[in-house]
UniProtKB/Swiss-Prot annotation:
The lineage of its organism: Eukaryota, Metazoa, Chordata, Craniata, Vertebrata. Bifunctional enzyme that catalyzes the enolization of 2,3-diketo-5-methylthiopentyl-1-phosphate (DK-MTP-1-P) into the intermediate 2-hydroxy-3-keto-5-methylthiopentenyl-1-phosphate (HK-MTPenyl-1-P), which is then dephosphorylated to form the acireductone 1,2-dihydroxy-3-keto-5-methylthiopentene (DHK-MTPene). It catalyses: 5-methylsulfanyl-2,3-dioxopentyl phosphate + H2O = 1,2-dihydroxy-5-(methylsulfanyl)pent-1-en-3-one + phosphate. This is Enolase-phosphatase E1. Substrate binds at S153, S154, K187. It comes from Homo sapiens (Human). Monomer. Mg(2+) binds at D16, E18, D212. The gene is ENOPH1.
C-alpha cells in the first residue's frame, strides 16, 4: 500500500465529496436524476411555502443574470393567480433547473433548491448517502489524532449535512467540524481556500485538501494549501503529467499522520 505522509504542520483535513468521499455514481445516477424526475412534483406540492418561493426567487434572479447565455431558460414573474399561469411558471422553473443541470452548473440558486429537495427525500427515508468503505474509519482515526475535518463541496452546506446525517453508515455528522460551499467561493479559485483558512482560524499551509479534481487541487496549491488527488472508481482520468505532479491516493487509509504515532 502506498503511504502518503501528511506534513507535520497540517492540523485540518478538508474534504471534497463527489469522487472523494462518495462514489461519483451515487451523485450522477441517484442524486441528480432524482431532482430531474421529481422537481415538478416537488414544486407543485410546496409552491405556497415561503422556502419554495425563496428558492424560485433566487432561480429567477439567476435566470436574469444568465439571459445572455445560449439556450438560457427565463423564469417569468407571476402575472396573475390563474391555474394556467401557475403551471406555466412551474414549468419554466422545471425547464430552467433541467437546463442548468444539463450544463453541470453549480449556481447557488440551483444548489439551494436541490438541497431542499434532497432534504425531503432523505428525511422521508427515500434515499441514503453512500460513502467509500475507507472514509468513516479513516476520519475517525484522524480525529482521534487531533485533526479537524471540514467539508468543501459545490453542493450546499444543507445538502452536505443531509449526506452525512443520512448515510448507509448512519448519522456521521459528528465526525465533521464544519462545512463550506460555493457561498465562500468557487473551488477552482485560490481565494476560496484563503477564506476557508480565515474562517477556520488557521494558516492555509495547515490544511490538507483531498479532491479528485486537479483544477481544484491547483487552485488550493496557489493558496499554499497542501493537496492530494484522490483516485476512485468512476473518476475522470488523469494525464501523465498530473499523475507525476500530484500526490495520489486511492484510499483515505493511505494517509499517514506522523502525529498519530
Amino acid at each position: 500500500m502506498v503511504v502518503l505522509s501528511v506534513p507535520a504542520e497540517v492540523t485540518v483535513i478538508l474534504l471534497d465529496i463527489e469522487g472523494t468521499t462518495t462514489p461519483i455514481a451515487f451523485v450522477k445516477d441517484i442524486l441528480f436524476p432524482y431532482i430531474e424526475e421529481n422537481v415538478k412534483e416537488y414544486l407543485q406540492t410546496h409552491w405556497e411555502e415561503e422556502e419554495c418561493q425563496q428558492d424560485v426567487s433566487l432561480l429567477r434572479k439567476q435566470a436574469e443574470e444568465d439571459a445572455h447565455l445560449d439556450g438560457a431558460v427565463p423564469i417569468p414573474a407571476a402575472s396573475g393567480n390563474g391555474v394556467d399561469d401557475l403551471q406555466q411558471m412551474i414549468q419554466a422553473v422545471v425547464d430552467n433547473v433541467c437546463w442548468q443541470m444539463s450544463l453541470d452548473r453549480k449556481t447557488t440558486a440551483l444548489k439551494q433548491l436541490q438541497g431542499h429537495m434532497w432534504r425531503a427525500a432523505f428525511t422521508a427515508g427515500r434515499m441514503k448517502a453512500e460513502f467509500f468503505a475507507d472514509v468513516v474509519p479513516a476520519v475517525r482515526k484522524w480525529r482521534e489524532a487531533g485533526m479537524k475535518v471540514y467539508i468543501y463541496s459545490s453542493g450546499s452546506v444543507e445538502a452536505q449535512k443531509l449526506l452525512f446525517g443520512h448515510s448507509t453508515e448512519g448519522d456521521i455528522l459528528e465526525l465533521v467540524d464544519g462545512h463550506f460551499d460555493t457561498k465562500i467561493g468557487h473551488k477552482v479559485e485560490s481565494e476560496s481556500y484563503r477564506k476557508i483558512a480565515d474562517s477556520i482560524g488557521c494558516s492555509t499551509n495547515n490544511i490538507l485538501f483531498l479532491t479528485d479534481v486537479t483544477r481544484e487541487a491547483s487552485a488550493a496549491e496557489e493558496a499554499d494549501v497542501h493537496v492530494a488527488v484522490v483516485v476512485r472508481p468512476g473518476n475522470a482520468g488523469l494525464t501523465d503529467d498530473e499523475k507525476t505532479y500530484y500526490s495520489l491516493i486511492t484510499s483515505f487509509s493511505e494517509l499517514y499522520l506522523p502525529s498519530s504515532t
